[in-house]
Amino acid sequence: MFPEPPTPGSPAPETPPDSSRIRQGAVPAWVLATILLGSGLLVFSSCFCLYRKRCRRRMGKKSQAQAQVHLQEVKELGRSYIDKVQPEIEELDPSPSMPGQQVLDKHQLGRLQYSLDYDFQTGQLLVGILQAEGLAALDLGGSSDPYVSVYLLPDKRRRHETKVHRQTLNPHFGETFAFKVPYVELGGRVLVMAVYDFDRFSRNDAIGEVRVPMSSVNLGRPVQAWRELQVAPKEEQEKLGDICFSLRYVPTAGKLTVIVLEAKNLKKMDVGGLSDPYVKVHLLQGGKKVRKKKTTIKKNTLNPYYNEAFSFEVPCDQVQKVQVELTVLDYDKLGKNEAIGRVAVGTAVGGAGLRHWADMLANPRRPIAQWHSLRPPDRARPIPAP
């Protein structure tokens, strides 16, 4: 029952290991390797995260710098077009449009200095628009934004226009225009130099004009003269209505947004004296339609309100090669939809369409709204861009 005592000379029994000795012993190698590996991975991950963060900052700064370059390029492009453009013939209003404004007599209109010369070698009449002074103030601020439209009757379509001079009643133009006309035909022509006040949001008011029968001019030597402005006769023409829309271009995203806002005084197309108008918006490139959008139909109205936005992808290097065309049509449930009028904007369009486009480019990311007079559908087709 009791263990036998050890006999002399026999080996002593083994004693159990002491746990305190194990805790004080050496750590196994695999544990150290695991700890070192984990620490290394942690340090590597931290360094990698910091590296990626710095790379993102650099890329962000680079893209921001590129965006600034795009914005500056587009702004300069827009400014280069602004001074080259003037309103279309259809937008000129010979009568003052300010409320309560009376027709000014010739003593209040101002006067114009011009020059005439004929180049017998090239068969060209050279008309110089030098300056004007004492022009009538047609703006609310007591000033005007004058420019001069020059043409030879009976041809009203072949016009030249000076630049618009902002907020002045004494503009200095200093511009010369050439009309290729055989000398034997000049006697039957009448030179018209009409001074207008430019208005972005309405029709342009006629300040006055000078008419010079060419039969009364001796072109054997250059002529320079001052003439008092006369009241311009009102030209009757079919009114198709006006449309207001805004343009917004974001160069960094290559995004063009057209917002069709409203139209007014549209031509009556239905038997009942109204119309069911809607607007088609086309993006053209090289004279060909590449994208098409359209608004909703507004029933029984000549003054529709839309406020509908349409976006097109236009890369920055293509913005000079595209045009936007807006056509107002009358919806007909039973027959063919009939076009009321059309307007186009772009660098190859000219007139108010070019001015609106140039203002959009000069103010990237900002919507630029403007009223446009509708033109007959067969006369508003944009010119293909080069």
Swiss-Prot record:
<keyword id="KW-1133">Transmembrane helix</keyword>
<feature type="binding site">
    <location>
        <position position="205"/>
    </location>
    <ligand>
        <name>Ca(2+) 2</name>
    </ligand>
</feature>
<dbReference type="GO" id="GO:0061891">
    <property type="term" value="F:calcium ion sensor activity"/>
</dbReference>
<dbReference type="InterPro" id="IPR001565">
    <property type="entry name" value="Synaptotagmin"/>
</dbReference>
<dbReference type="Pfam" id="PF00168">
    <property type="entry name" value="C2"/>
</dbReference>
<feature type="binding site">
    <location>
        <position position="332"/>
    </location>
    <ligand>
        <name>Ca(2+) 4</name>
    </ligand>
</feature>
<feature type="binding site">
    <location>
        <position position="198"/>
    </location>
    <ligand>
        <name>Ca(2+) 1</name>
    </ligand>
</feature>
<dbReference type="GO" id="GO:0000149">
    <property type="term" value="F:SNARE binding"/>
</dbReference>
<dbReference type="GO" id="GO:0017156">
    <property type="term" value="P:calcium-ion regulated exocytosis"/>
</dbReference>
<dbReference type="GO" id="GO:0030424">
    <property type="term" value="C:axon"/>
</dbReference>
<feature type="binding site">
    <location>
        <position position="199"/>
    </location>
    <ligand>
        <name>Ca(2+) 1</name>
    </ligand>
</feature>
<dbReference type="GO" id="GO:0030672">
    <property type="term" value="C:synaptic vesicle membrane"/>
</dbReference>
<dbReference type="GO" id="GO:0099502">
    <property type="term" value="P:calcium-dependent activation of synaptic vesicle fusion"/>
</dbReference>
<dbReference type="GO" id="GO:0005544">
    <property type="term" value="F:calcium-dependent phospholipid binding"/>
</dbReference>
<feature type="binding site">
    <location>
        <position position="139"/>
    </location>
    <ligand>
        <name>Ca(2+) 1</name>
    </ligand>
</feature>
<dbReference type="GO" id="GO:0016192">
    <property type="term" value="P:vesicle-mediated transport"/>
</dbReference>
<keyword id="KW-0677">Repeat</keyword>
<feature type="binding site">
    <location>
        <position position="138"/>
    </location>
    <ligand>
        <name>Ca(2+) 2</name>
    </ligand>
</feature>
<keyword id="KW-0479">Metal-binding</keyword>
<feature type="binding site">
    <location>
        <position position="197"/>
    </location>
    <ligand>
        <name>Ca(2+) 1</name>
    </ligand>
</feature>
<keyword id="KW-0472">Membrane</keyword>
<dbReference type="GO" id="GO:0048471">
    <property type="term" value="C:perinuclear region of cytoplasm"/>
</dbReference>
<dbReference type="GO" id="GO:2000300">
    <property type="term" value="P:regulation of synaptic vesicle exocytosis"/>
</dbReference>
<feature type="binding site">
    <location>
        <position position="205"/>
    </location>
    <ligand>
        <name>Ca(2+) 3</name>
    </ligand>
</feature>
<keyword id="KW-0106">Calcium</keyword>
<comment type="subunit">
    <text>Homodimer. Interacts with both alpha- and beta-tubulin.</text>
</comment>
<dbReference type="GO" id="GO:0005886">
    <property type="term" value="C:plasma membrane"/>
</dbReference>
<keyword id="KW-0770">Synapse</keyword>
<dbReference type="GO" id="GO:0031045">
    <property type="term" value="C:dense core granule"/>
</dbReference>
<feature type="binding site">
    <location>
        <position position="199"/>
    </location>
    <ligand>
        <name>Ca(2+) 2</name>
    </ligand>
</feature>
<keyword id="KW-0967">Endosome</keyword>
<dbReference type="GO" id="GO:0001786">
    <property type="term" value="F:phosphatidylserine binding"/>
</dbReference>
<dbReference type="GO" id="GO:0070382">
    <property type="term" value="C:exocytic vesicle"/>
</dbReference>
<dbReference type="GO" id="GO:0046982">
    <property type="term" value="F:protein heterodimerization activity"/>
</dbReference>
<dbReference type="GO" id="GO:0043025">
    <property type="term" value="C:neuronal cell body"/>
</dbReference>
<feature type="topological domain" description="Vesicular">
    <location>
        <begin position="1"/>
        <end position="24"/>
    </location>
</feature>
<dbReference type="InterPro" id="IPR035892">
    <property type="entry name" value="C2_domain_sf"/>
</dbReference>
<feature type="region of interest" description="Disordered">
    <location>
        <begin position="1"/>
        <end position="21"/>
    </location>
</feature>
<protein>
    <recommendedName>
        <fullName>Synaptotagmin-5</fullName>
    </recommendedName>
</protein>
<feature type="binding site">
    <location>
        <position position="145"/>
    </location>
    <ligand>
        <name>Ca(2+) 1</name>
    </ligand>
</feature>
<feature type="binding site">
    <location>
        <position position="139"/>
    </location>
    <ligand>
        <name>Ca(2+) 2</name>
    </ligand>
</feature>
<feature type="binding site">
    <location>
        <position position="197"/>
    </location>
    <ligand>
        <name>Ca(2+) 2</name>
    </ligand>
</feature>
